[in-house]
Curated annotation (Swiss-Prot):
Keywords: Nucleotide-binding
A GO CC term attached to the entry: cytosol
Keyword Transferase: no
Annotated family: Belongs to the YajQ family.
Reported function: Nucleotide-binding protein.
Highest taxon above the source species: Bacteria
InterPro entries associated with the record: DUF520, UPF0234-like_C, UPF0234_N, YajQ-like_sf
This protein's name: Nucleotide-binding protein DET1318
GO molecular function, one term: nucleotide binding
């Protein structure tokens, strides 16, 4: 029986490249000359910490980071931007969490959606992935299209497609 796995994985090397390119782009911008800012990727905790002189610069850093993520084919849905808060002397700070893996809530939403499509498919949650099996490969391809059309707040990838 044909099957495939639905996962949500972020390539941390591509994220590291996006952060480094964002730093390089910000260094070349005129409005960031002599500006103090920090953009740090913490691979272990899967988060990005940003500190800037003010909220305007903080928003510009976030926009530049998102542009670089798109350039490296990382979906911006994997970034969970927290609200900015003020630290000493008017500097603004925020933390961006990188969503990696499917949570139980998201996985259950996806399986409910699959069941609601009335396609002859079985889905099972296996840790941080969902295994979908069906009698025809066409049904699997159709569910891939339908899942891409939905918004589950995480980027979805399809792996291990077997005939």
């Amino acid at each position: 029986m044909p099957s495939l796995d639905v996962v949500s994985v972020v390539d941390m090397q591509a994220m590291d490249n996006a952060v480094n390119n964002a730093k390089r782009d910000l260094g070349n911008r005129y409005d960031f000359k002599n500006a103090k800012y920090e953009l740090v990727l913490n691979r272990k905790d899967k988060k990005i910490e940003i500190v800037a002189e003010d909220e305007f610069k903080l928003k510009a850093i976030i926009e530049t980071l998102i542009q670089q993520c798109v350039r490296f084919k990382l979906d911006s849905k994997c970034l969970d931007v927290a609200d900015a808060h003020t630290v000493s002397l008017g500097a603004a700070k925020t933390e961006i969490k990188i969503k990696d893996g499917l949570t139980k809530e998201t996985a259950s939403k996806i399986t409910k959606f699959i069941k609601s499509t009335k396609l002859k498919l079985d889905s099972a949650i296996q840790g941080e992935q969902i295994r979908i099996t069906g009698k025809q490969i066409d049904d699997l391809q159709e569910i891939m299209q339908l899942l891409n059309g939905q918004d589950f707040d995480v980027p979805l990838q399809y792996v291990n497609m077997k005939r």
